[in-house]
Amino acid sequence: MDSERGQGTVEWAGMLCVVSLLLLGLVAAGIRVPRAELAQAVADRILCAAALADGCGDEPTLIAAYGSEVGEMVREHMPSLVFEQGSRAVPVDFRRCRSTECGEGPEDGLVHRTEEHLPVTAFVHVVDCREGEETEGVDCSGDRAGNLYLQYWTYYADSATLRGVPIAGAKGYHHDDWEGVQFRIRPDGSVDERASSHNGYNSGLESSRNWGSDAGIGPLKEGAEALGARGVNGWGPETGYLFVSGGSHAGNTFDLTDSNRYTPGRRVHLIPLEDIATTSTAHFAISPPWLKEVWLDPEAEGTS
């Protein structure tokens, strides 16, 4: 990821020169300007125009859907995607792509678009359980009360857990794969994170501790949680990363700062999902987010 940071430094320096020249021109023309505020506004516009951050244009839409405070938090907490080595798939907008061919990107480096120039995309659902702000129809009982939940959903045209294993055939394969990562923001400002993985949720732990959750075997999952081997219902501290397994796209929140295939969070195109959930007539082999239990119960332990 360092290469993008280096490139961004050069672009940022160039942008500052442009901003400075603009401000000098205004001053020379005798126009009074609010210094820092205008500089920031101009810089933001140039960044978007230069496409340095693919997701920078999302914020107005997010604010319109969720209000200024929550809309900005949705943009801020979108994690960076870290893809397993050798994988090609990236999450896309299902309304524009539902085949493997249009949903594949480069095998390494910075990935922000597919080879057919579709943006890396995540859909957003917000469950607000803060006092006086409760989302209508959701479960905000018990420990949920006071929390703000941000759900980011990713769509892939298919899932193949055993892709590349000749003897497996079609086993483990299905069309329409919905995965995602969720954040729980507590009243004290602390943030938890968990990622969908097969039948449950995981966060930053070695796979052996998550077998019960992945397989949907309640006693194994509950035993691991009772022993403190994993967080309850897969929650753990926010890392700002979503690790995506190849083939199955099962997730985890591994804190990986060095990967050869990644998408920075700020370059993921974000789309509010609430209106789509009420109007979409699309059919899926796997239940879409709005038909999953966690859509209304943000502490649900399963992914169905």
Per-region residue spans from a language model:
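Actinobacteria-biased recognition of intrinsically disordered, low-complexity terminal regions
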Residues: 1-5, 55-57
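N-terminal single-pass transmembrane signal-anchor helix
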Residues: 4-29
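Aliphatic-rich helix starts adjacent to a transmembrane/signal segment
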Residues: 22, 26-60
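A domain-level signal for the mature, folded cores of soluble proteins
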Residues: 59-179, 189-304
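Short beta-strand micro-motifs enriched in acidic
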Residues: 184-188
